[in-house]
Amino acid sequence: MSGAFGQLVMYLAQQIEAGATLVAILLTIILPFLPESLVEQPEKIMIVVGFAGQGLFAMRFIIQWLSSEKQARSVIPIAFWYFSIGGGSVLFLYAIWRQDLVFMSGQGLGLFIYLRNLYFVRRSRAFTVSEGD
């Protein structure tokens, strides 16, 4: 990546890594059994962050599956969109840290879609409530 966008991504990646270092410092203070080398290797924290984001993202399918089983039909509960946004946001930060344009593009577009769908759900519920008055 080059130009202003590349510089912005690099700056954001450095800030995310600084945050990971801070988290590592706090973890080694709170959990003294953790190795001190964790502070010098923020990429280990970021790998955990990446897996956490992937876990949040995967939960949306489990929630959708359980809701569909409960109702004996295919449904997408509102929690699906919240987990999509949570997991997508964490994975987007992880993609910025990795400076991976393909990953950033996919997660960025996904976040837009999840937020838009949540907007439609909220608007539909507000419309249904106001219609019932």
Please identify what each model-predicted range represents:
Residues 1-133:
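Alpha-helical membrane-protein topology signature
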